[in-house]
């Protein structure tokens, strides 16, 4: 059984390959089409910088990093000023996107299998499997309708929520230092281009 870090890394292609759908497409159709597009980018002839930019655009178009940030922060945003909250959202977005888009290119484009789609009102769950030469990883998306599009509000890798995984890290950072200390760490990582 691979370690959680390896599982999260291997799943990043599925994370990075999503974008805002056309109005007529459901969550599963969107997921399938954009995963294929992400593989095209990774397997394409562009250089690393061009691929990073293209994958970053896909993430910006689909991933609801503010919703992910709220889940990851938990109660730590309570009582914070608007400026602090907005900075946290911005830093989280930049850190999350940079981390997963950069790590994406560590892997050859994998194959995907598609499971079930469940739509309840304005939310949906889409099940997929990331298939690499040596492993298979279940990656389930939680999506929310936003106007005519669908955006991912959480991603579960082998049943582990990425947002809750970040929350555990942030809880530890705040307990050790403070919320301002957490912001300082995020500023440093984003400023240094650190995707680790």
Please provide the spans of the model-predicted regions.
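Bacterial N-terminal signal peptides that target proteins for export
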Residues: 1-9
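Bacterial N-terminal signal peptides
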Residues: 8-17
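Sec/Tat signal peptide C-region and signal peptidase I cleavage site
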Residues: 18-24
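Early exported N-terminus immediately downstream of N-terminal targeting peptides
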Residues: 26-100
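Surface-exposed, polar/charged faces of alpha-helical domains
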Residues: 40, 47-50, 79-83, 109, ...
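Surface-exposed, charged secondary-structure patches
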Residues: 97-137, 189-196
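Short beta-strand edge/turn micro-motifs at domain boundaries
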Residues: 136-165
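Low-complexity, intrinsically disordered terminal/linker segments enriched in charged
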Residues: 154-196
């Amino acid at each position: 059984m691979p370690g959680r870090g390896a599982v999260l890394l291997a799943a990043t292609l599925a994370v990075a390959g999503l974008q805002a759908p056309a109005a007529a497409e459901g969550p599963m159709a969107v997921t399938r089409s954009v995963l294929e597009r992400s593989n095209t980018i990774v397997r394409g002839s562009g250089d690393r910088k061009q691929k990073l930019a293209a994958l970053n655009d896909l993430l910006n178009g689909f991933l609801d990093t503010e919703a992910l940030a709220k889940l990851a922060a938990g109660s730590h945003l309570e009582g914070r000023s608007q400026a602090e909250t907005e900075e946290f959202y911005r830093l989280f977005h930049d850190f999350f996107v940079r981390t997963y888009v950069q790590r994406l290119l560590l892997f050859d484009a994998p194959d995907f299998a598609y499971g079930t789609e469940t739509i309840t009102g304005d939310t949906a769950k889409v099940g997929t499997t990331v298939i690499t030469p040596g492993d298979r990883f279940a990656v389930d998306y939680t999506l929310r309708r936003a106007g005519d599009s669908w955006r991912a509000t959480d991603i579960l890798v082998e049943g582990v929520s990425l947002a809750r995984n970040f929350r555990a890290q942030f809880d530890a950072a705040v307990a050790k230092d403070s919320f301002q200390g957490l912001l300082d760490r995020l500023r440093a990582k984003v400023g240094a281009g650190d995707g680790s």
